[in-house]
């Protein structure tokens, strides 16, 4: 069949050329219109359920809200893990499904389960809401709003009602979360002493205010042949008119709201969170995109919308988009990988020209590159995959191998044409016949060598989870581009050879061999003769090097993925629970000042607390700081160490330092935004926190551990209002009345909405701050008895101070506390091994408590096992492919002896660079084994041809065959190796982090 393909191509040369040009044009067009992203879709199918629970304490939220939701979804079809966090007034449940679950099916399953929960939740709890469908790479843009004279109330209103709707209307946006500033609301602030004076009960106030600002309908009337809609218009946004609403009549005189309360416009209380930019109060707007939406294109649309909005904003309002912009990381990453790809191509050109010394042969070989790459892009596009650093990385790693097939074909055609030209004129064959026979001669080695490399990449496709999502596109891009290069070598390359190499040349035939090729053959022949004369020395030295390399391999550290350089730090600063938002804000400002003192950091933005229905449920004691940076002379690690040093002066604060995407990957893997998570499960939070600190103390001096923290799940101050039931009975006060009194006076109740020029604001009733600002004032609040008399709350209830949990985190319906850590200066697996040893030796857990470990190392161990097993299988398949070609087990085994030689160089490359074996490095070894067998295949195949067709002996065929194939082997090896140099040397640049370990391993292995 391959002969037919070559023959058809040579007989239809114009058709092949036109088809190739059309393919190149179509692929280029597709490349410019394919979605570009930094990584493939890494998100595990996860559905987030969020529930606002008023002012409930964390323990009540856990029992009354979180537990019913967890129970409903736990055990549902496809669910692998359920995590939850219950904080004051808020519940968030993460329902994680198996990786192969369709996200729309997952959301449907959760929605059906939630339908059974609603009736079981308390009346004052909001409806469980599904979070928007997004991903860990979905956070697109953080927009900062600051102002000089505009109030924070007006600034927040602008964000909520002008900017947010405009951004949400942009196609592809999933969510726009606003944090900071003051949320506007209309307030009716009750004064108990005035209510007592006028004899107004709370029930009367609530009866009047509930729905007081809602219009009513009066049906229709017909008059003069017209139909008139009758409306009762009571809705108003005028505070004075609201204040004049009558509550009751006393002795014929009306008592209005303004008589018993302050009616005003104010800021929502309590505040859930606040924000700042460069230490200045701000409003931060976080934009999240929908899945399968182009990041760069959507960012451009959003920035255009913001620029348009800026024209109509107050002059003092500043809009900044440089806080976090994911497209900046994408552009930098893609640009770096593309640069490495281009530079690799230049190295390939240099190698080809040096060895071929002929412009035409170089051009023919290079044509393979663009065609193979555009075919890969077309296949990725029609598979629904994006262009990202992984797919481009696959092409960059393959770029040296893409010209291999063409090199072998062109070199063989060139040699046969030269030999044909040397024949007498009457004995010369037609050019097309020479090209056909020369191409046919190497067709099977070309195809088999390609299949071998493809088989070596098969283990990639057995990876599951996040690592599979990340690395499979790299394998697809590599394999598709490699197959495309083989097809080009069988079709277009012979056609171009017939056109460019088949013309009239000088009498002495085609140009002579290049000087480099002649020089290499001369010296190689000497070395080969010496090696054949000293077989034992060569074998002994090789075995010794292999043993040393094997021993060195087992001393290398192990990690999951290399650290990324995202150009931004994400820093969590957490204080003790129970601290006020104002005090937490002060600590956050100190952290901002310290960060801005670092030269590389030009701006910072901080979120303290959370926004409404925000799945990143941070307490008011936690600040999250985004700190973008630009490296200028110092390395990423040096800047990171200075950040750690600067922030270490914040006494009483726990510091966690990550990067925007990296810490979201960590959170997806273990539920914790750190490399390592020690999960302690139990029932008693105080005991768990004590054990957590014991674990922290036990592992604190482990070499390489950094950012060691215990989750701040500890008790915070509470005020409990506990009814004296016998006194309630004495005064005829029901529990329902008592609960309403506490809720309305303390937390407040939203009784209606106020509509103001297309905007909607809450109308809230609660006690004035002066009457509820301390324990003594709460005791003096007046509750109505059955006769409408005012009774001090202290008569019927105890008001006492106590302690209660601030946050309760759970996993699979079990309370947990996490001791988290990152690594610095040491490999992940060694740090984890030391941690596990310390914990096992020093920690005695009570009955009912247990520890689980989570984080990147789990994925690293699982992926390493998978790759090891599947690599052994791929080696067996490679042996079978070799055996099918040669029908000789010993020859197939000899070719596989290249693998130990390749291992030697790969191991020493790691020893001299990172000193760690990561998943990308393992993949580098796997691909190296496939590439290494290619050269052996070409040699053995040519040895057999010389022995079978020309009757040479073994030694003579080895000498002649090795010299004949030296050029193509050196060209393929050098082009493959040198093309990887840019990736190997620039591993610290954004986008190159994952491909760099692969490139180093392959480069080192090819050299040996």
Question: Which residue ranges define each predicted feature?
Answer:
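Helix-loop junctions and hydrophobic alpha-helical segments within the transmembrane domains
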Residues: 330, 334, 410, 415-448, ...
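Extracytoplasmic/periplasmic membrane-proximal domains and adjacent transmembrane bundles
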Residues: 8, 39, 50, 118, ...
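Flexible hinge/switch segments at interdomain interfaces of large molecular machines
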Residues: 36-46, 83-89, 124-148, 177-183, ...
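Interfacial helix-loop-helix hairpins and adjacent transmembrane helices
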Residues: 1-17, 415-437, 466, 472, ...
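Signature of alpha-helical transmembrane segments and their immediate interfacial
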Residues: 2-36, 440-442, 510-562, 602, ...
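Transmembrane helices with small-residue packing motifs
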Residues: 14, 21-57, 115-124, 381, ...
């Amino acid at each position: 069949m391959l002969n037919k393909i070559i023959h058809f191509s040579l007989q239809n040369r114009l058709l092949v050329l036109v088809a190739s040009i059309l393919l190149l044009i179509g692929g280029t067009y597709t490349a410019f219109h394919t979605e570009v992203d930094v990584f493939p879709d890494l998100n595990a199918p996860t559905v987030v359920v969020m529930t606002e629970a008023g002012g409930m304490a964390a323990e009540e939220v856990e029992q009354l809200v979180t537990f019913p939701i967890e129970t409903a979804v736990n055990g549902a079809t496809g669910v692998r893990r359920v995590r939850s966090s219950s904080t004051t007034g808020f519940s968030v449940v993460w329902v994680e499904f198996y990786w192969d679950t369709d996200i729309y099916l997952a959301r449907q399953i959760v929605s059906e389960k939630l339908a059974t929960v609603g009736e079981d939740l308390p009346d004052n709890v909001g409806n469980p809401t599904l979070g928007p469908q997004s991903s860990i790479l979905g956070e697109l843009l953080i927009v900062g709003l600051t102002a000089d004279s505009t109030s924070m109330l007006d600034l927040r209103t602008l964000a909520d009602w002008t900017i947010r709707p405009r951004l949400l209307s942009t196609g592809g946006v999933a969510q726009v979360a606003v944090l900071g500033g003051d949320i506007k609301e209309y307030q009716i602030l009750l004064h108990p002493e005035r209510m007592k004076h006028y004899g107004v009960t709370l029930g009367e106030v609530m009866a009047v205010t509930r729905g007081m600002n809602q219009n009513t309908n009066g049906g229709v009337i017909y008059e003069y042949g017209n139909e008139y809609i009758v409306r009762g218009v009571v809705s108003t946004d005028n505070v004075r008119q609201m204040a004049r609403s009558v509550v009751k009549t006393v002795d014929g005189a009306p008592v209005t709201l303004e008589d018993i309360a302050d009616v005003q416009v104010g800021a929502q209380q309590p505040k859930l969170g606040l924000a700042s930019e460069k230490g200045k109060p701000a409003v931060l707007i976080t934009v999240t995109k929908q899945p399968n939406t182009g990041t760069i294109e959507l960012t451009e649309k959003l920035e255009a919308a913001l620029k348009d909005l800026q024209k109509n904003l107050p002059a003092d309002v500043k809009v900044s988009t440089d806080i976090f912009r994911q497209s900046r990381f994408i552009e930098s990453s893609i640009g770096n990988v593309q640069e490495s790809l281009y530079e690799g191509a230049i190295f390939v050109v240099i190698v080809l020209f040096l060895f071929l010394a002929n412009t035409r042969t170089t051009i023919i070989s290079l044509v393979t590159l663009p065609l193979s790459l555009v075919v890969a892009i077309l296949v990725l596009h029609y598979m629904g995959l994006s262009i990202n650093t992984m797919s481009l990385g696959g092409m960059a790693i393959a770029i040296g191998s893409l010209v291999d097939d063409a090199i072998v074909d062109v070199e063989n055609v060139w040699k046969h044409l030269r030999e044909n030209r040397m024949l007498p004129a009457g004995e010369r064959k037609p050019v097309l016949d020479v090209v056909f026979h020369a191409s046919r001669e190497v067709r099977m080695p070309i195809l088999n060598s390609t299949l071998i490399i493809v088989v070596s990449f098969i283990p990639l496709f057995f990876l599951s989870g996040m690592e599979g999502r990340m690395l499979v596109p790299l394998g697809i891009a590599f394999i598709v581009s490699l197959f495309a290069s083989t097809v080009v070598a069988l079709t277009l390359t012979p056609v171009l050879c017939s056109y460019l190499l088949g013309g009239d040349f000088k009498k002495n035939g085609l140009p002579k061999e290049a000087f480099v090729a002649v020089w290499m053959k001369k010296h190689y022949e000497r070395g080969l003769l010496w090696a054949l004369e000293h077989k034992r020395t060569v074998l002994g030295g090789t075995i010794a090097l292999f043993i040393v390399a094997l021993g060195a391999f087992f001393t290398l550290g192990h990690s999951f993925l290399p650290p990324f350089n995202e150009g931004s730090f994400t820093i969590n600063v957490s204080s003790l629970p129970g601290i006020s938002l104002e005090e937490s804000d002060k600590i956050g400002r100190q952290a901002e000042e310290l960060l801005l003192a670092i030269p590389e950091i030009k701006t910072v933005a901080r979120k303290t607390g959370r926004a409404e229905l925000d799945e990143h449920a941070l307490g008011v004691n936690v600040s999250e700081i985004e700190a973008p940076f630009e490296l200028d002379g110092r390395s990423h690690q040096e800047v990171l160490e200075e950040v750690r040093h600067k922030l270490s002066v914040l006494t009483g604060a726990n510091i966690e330092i990550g990067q925007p995407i990296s810490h979201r990957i960590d959170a997806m893997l273990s539920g914790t935004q750190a490399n390592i998570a020690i999960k302690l499960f139990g029932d008693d939070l105080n005991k768990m926190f004590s054990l957590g600190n014991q674990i922290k103390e036990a592992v604190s001096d482990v070499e390489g551990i950094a950012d060691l923290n215990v989750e701040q799940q500890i008790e915070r101050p509470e005020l409990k209002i506990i009814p004296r039931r016998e006194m309630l009975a004495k005064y005829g006060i029901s529990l329902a009345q008592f609960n309403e009194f506490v809720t309305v006076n303390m937390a407040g109740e939203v009784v209606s909405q106020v509509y103001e020029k297309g905007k909607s604001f809450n109308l809230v009733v609660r006690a004035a701050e002066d009457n509820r600002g301390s324990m003594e004032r709460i005791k003096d609040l007046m509750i109505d008895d059955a006769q409408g008399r005012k009774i001090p709350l202290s008569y019927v209830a105890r008001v006492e101070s106590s302690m209660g949990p601030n946050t309760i985190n759970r996993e699979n319906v079990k309370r947990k506390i996490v001791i988290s850590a990152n690594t610095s200066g040491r490999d992940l697996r060694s740090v984890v091994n030391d941690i596990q040893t310390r914990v096992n030796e020093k920690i005695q857990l009570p009955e009912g408590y247990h520890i689980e470990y989570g984080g990147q190392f789990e994925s690293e161990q699982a992926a390493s096992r998978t790759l090891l097993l599947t690599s052994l299988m791929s080696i067996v398949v490679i042996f079978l492919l070799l055996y099918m070609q040669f029908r000789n087990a010993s020859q197939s085994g000899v070719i596989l002896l290249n693998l130990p030689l390749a291992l030697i160089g790969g191991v020493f490359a790691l020893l001299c660079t990172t000193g760690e074996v990561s998943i990308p490095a393992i993949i580098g070894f796997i691909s190296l084994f496939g590439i290494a067998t290619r050269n052996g295949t070409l040699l053995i195949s040519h040895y057999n041809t010389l022995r079978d067709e020309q009757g040479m002996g073994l030694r003579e065929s080895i000498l002649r065959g090795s010299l004949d194939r030296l050029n193509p082997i050196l060209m393929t090896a050098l082009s493959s190796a040198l093309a990887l140099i840019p990736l190997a040397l620039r591993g610290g640049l954004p986008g190159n982090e994952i491909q760099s370990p692969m490139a180093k391993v392959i480069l080192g292995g090819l050299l040996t």
